[in-house]
Curated annotation (Swiss-Prot):
GO terms for cellular component: mitochondrion. InterPro entries: L-lactate/malate_DH, L-lactate_DH, L-lactate_DH_AS, Lactate/malate_DH_C, Lactate/malate_DH_N, Lactate_DH/Glyco_Ohase_4_C, NAD(P)-bd_dom_sf. This is L-lactate dehydrogenase B-B chain. Pathway: Fermentation; pyruvate fermentation to lactate; (S)-lactate from pyruvate: step 1/1. It comes from Danio rerio. The keyword Amino-acid biosynthesis does not apply. Keywords: Cytoplasm, NAD, Oxidoreductase. It is an enzyme of class 1 (oxidoreductase). Its EC number is 1.1.1.27. Pfam families: Ldh_1_C, Ldh_1_N.
Length: 334
């Protein structure tokens, strides 16, 4: 006797379907990983989402929770597994795994604790998705993006750190709040390290093409009577403040990562401040990853915008690079 399914559906094709073309994998289903996953789903960027973690019960629970919302989503397949075979044929892999930053802890103090974890993760990702683009989110993101590049063997344009995309978003929000406009109407960039030594590009800050530095030549300096420099200090302190208040940061970085994912998936050629290999740029001679304005497209980092920086801004950028290299040079087994 025919089943309900057989009576209801008449198949016209029974062969194998093509593998997913826009599969996204998120490694690590903690607060940040799930914020990235949900943001990608809500922006309809993936035709398959894979989740990977070592904590199997939580992993399965997160997968089921998302699957139960399938009616409200347009991603036909959501899978998970401890084994990296579940990530096969990913176009973009978002790496959020690692130990969490504690209150008052510098991102750079996290490095050695996370490097050993990456030694197990990255080779497995590349094994199953050799053509993927890697977006590293785990902190300290600049050093761990360098570590990922070394461990993966992938070309530098396909290994990207989330970098100062979020720092710049915080900067634009805080500056726009003070100016009484929407964040998208304030143009400003934070470059360098994602964290304590980030570099605000005051020389390029503008609204509708009007340079704030021309209106106030001292903007961002200690001599500035309006104390705009305080805004950058708030950017640096904001992550620590959120961690103090709620224990972690997740929503803003999730939205930021989805923004990067969209530019790559849709080949948008949008410019984002993300962490990329900067050796040979701005007089930096070491192999370090720092955030510069990068054109993101289907290749990953398609190109880097040569921003006109002041002597002081270049000096700060070099200082960022020196600090990161000082840590990287002592890393082993890369």
């Amino acid at each position: 006797m025919a089943s309900v399914l057989q009576k209801l559906i008449t198949p016209l094709f029974s062969g194998p379907l093509e593998p997913p073309r826009n599969k996204v994998t998120v490694v690590g289903v903690g607060q940040v990983g799930m914020a990235c996953a949900v943001s990608v789903l809500l922006r309809e960027l993936a035709d398959e989402l894979a989740l990977v973690d070592v904590v199997e019960d939580k992993l399965k629970g997160e997968m089921m929770d998302l699957q139960h919302g399938s009616l409200f989503l347009k991603t036909p397949k959501i899978v998970s597994g401890k084994d990296y075979s579940v990530t096969a044929n990913s176009r973009i892999v978002v790496v959020t795994a690692g130990v969490r930053q504690q209150e008052g802890e510098s991102r750079l103090n996290l490095v050695q604790r996370n490097v050993n974890i990456f030694k197990h993760i990255i080779p497995q990702i590349v094994k199953y998705s050799p053509n993927c683009i890697l977006i590293v989110v785990s902190n300290p993101v600049d050093v761990l993006t360098y570590v990922t590049w070394k461990l993966s063997g992938l070309p530098k344009h396909r290994v990207i750190g989330s970098g100062t995309n979020l720092d710049s978003a915080r900067f634009r929000y805080l500056m726009a709040e003070r100016l009484g406009i929407h964040p998208s109407s304030f143009n400003g960039w934070i470059l360098g390290e994602h964290g304590d030594s980030s570099v605000p590009v005051w020389s390029g800050a503008n609204v509708a093409g009007v340079s704030l530095q021309k209106l106030n030549p001292d903007i961002g300096k200690d001599t500035d009577r309006e104390n705009w420099k305080e805004t950058h200090k708030k950017v640096v302190d904001s992550a620590y403040e959120v961690i103090r208040l709620k224990g972690y940061t997740n929503w803003a970085i999730g939205l930021s990562v989805a923004d990067l994912t969209e530019s790559i998936m849709k080949n948008l050629n949008r410019v984002h401040p993300v962490s990329t290999m900067v050796k040979g740029m701005y007089g930096i001679s070491d192999e370090v990853y720092l955030s510069l304005p990068c054109v993101l497209n289907s290749a990953g980092v398609g190109s880097v915008v040569n921003m006109t920086l002041t002597v002081d801004e270049v000096s700060q950028l070099k200082k960022s690079a020196d600090m990161l290299w000082h840590i990287q040079r002592d890393l082993r087994d890369l």
